[in-house]
């Protein structure tokens, strides 16, 4: 499944062929990226979710401002 990483501040767009490739690029475990995308909530919203624990926020900080989308979510977003 194709994954798009988009940084709304810089408007930089990165394309990955799969979740594992995306995870490796950002220094995360593939299961982390899979869990975020399967959550059904844009990853950027997870950062502001008060119920998220400190570890999750630290993991998400590795995205450096990028938000992750599946290709379907991306097409709906743009």
Residue map of PLM features:
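Extended, non-core accessory segments
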Residues: 1-78
């Amino acid at each position: 499944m194709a994954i798009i990483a988009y940084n709304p501040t810089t408007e930089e767009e990165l394309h990955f062929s799969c979740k594992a490739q995306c995870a490796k690029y950002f220094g995360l475990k593939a299961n982390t990226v899979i869990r975020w995308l399967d959550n059904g909530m844009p990853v950027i919203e997870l950062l502001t979710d008060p119920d998220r624990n400190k570890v999750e926020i630290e993991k998400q900080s590795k995205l450096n401002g990028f938000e992750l989308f599946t290709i379907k979510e991306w097409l709906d977003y743009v």
